[in-house]
Amino acid sequence: MAVTKLVLVRHGESQWNNENRFTGWYDVDLSEKGVSEAKAAGKLLKAEGFSFDFAYTSVLKRAIHTLWNVLDELDQAWLPVEKSWKLNERHYGALQGLNKAETAEKYGDEQVKQWRRGFAVTPPELTKDDERYPGHDPRYAKLTDAELPTTESLALTIDRVVPYWNETILPRLKSGERVIIAAHGNSLRALVKYLDNMGEDEILELNIPTGVPLVYEFDENFKPIKHYYLGNAEEIAAKAAAVANQGKAK
């Protein structure tokens, strides 16, 4: 049976991950640790014999720079890359820039968990005159007002990620190309929910660690057979637990 592999990588730790702040579409860069995580992901992929024909990422530098570091370790810096806003992190609305633990102290752990992980729950909206509104950013100049979010739930994130998967990424896999996607915690959760047909309760508890390659294997009908992380299982579990705890009061 022919097996097709897809590699997903959540960006390495960002400066705002390190400061435990809601990031969303705010364009922060990787922290020093995040750069190291991205390089380590590349080394793991190289050790396992992976190479690629095409890469996808978002238009946010923490994902772009993660991909650069991964490809550099693979000696594939030349690889063609498509960047799309549809792979951006979920837009966190008026929460963007706020400290997660301080927000939990103000609103309660459960409310923040729902904002972070609830399937159809949207954080408080930005107004369009807010400097954080993506309509003020030149990289989104060609998008319509209807496409530009003022806040997003995971359900709304799925509404942009899944069509992009089906219309753009999946056809490339079906053509036989080897693909890597470097994206974000929630855009990847959106894709994982779709691929694994996960329920809303299941996705609430799913946390994707930073900078760890997640490999999906598909059968000849492009149905997922299995998926697994590359690396030390205990370390990966600890990183996923740390992601889950970010939204709790101190």
Curated annotation (Swiss-Prot):
Annotated EC: 5.4.2.11
Pfam annotation, one family: His_Phos_1
Binding site for substrate: 10-17, 23-24, 62, 89-92, 100, 116-117, 185-186
Gene3D superfamilies per the UniProt record, alphabetical: Phosphoglycerate mutase-like
GO biological process: gluconeogenesis; glycolytic process
CDD domains: HP_PGM_like
Top-level EC class: isomerase
Reaction equations catalysed: (2R)-2-phosphoglycerate = (2R)-3-phosphoglycerate
Active site: H11 (tele-phosphohistidine intermediate), E89 (proton donor/acceptor)
Alphabetized UniProt keyword annotations: Gluconeogenesis, Glycolysis, Isomerase
Positions of the record's site feature: Transition state stabilizer: H184
UniProt keyword annotation of Isomerase present: yes
GO molecular function, one term: phosphoglycerate mutase activity
Pathway where it operates: Carbohydrate degradation; glycolysis; pyruvate from D-glyceraldehyde 3-phosphate: step 3/5
InterPro entries, per the entry: His_Pase_superF_clade-1 (IPR013078), His_PPase_superfam (IPR029033), PG/BPGM_mutase_AS (IPR001345), Phosphogly_mut1 (IPR005952)
Signal sequence bounds: none
Family as reported in the entry's similarity comment: Belongs to the phosphoglycerate mutase family. BPG-dependent PGAM subfamily.
Subunit-structure text: Homodimer.
Function recorded in the entry: Catalyzes the interconversion of 2-phosphoglycerate and 3-phosphoglycerate.
Protein's UniProt name: 2,3-bisphosphoglycerate-dependent phosphoglycerate mutase
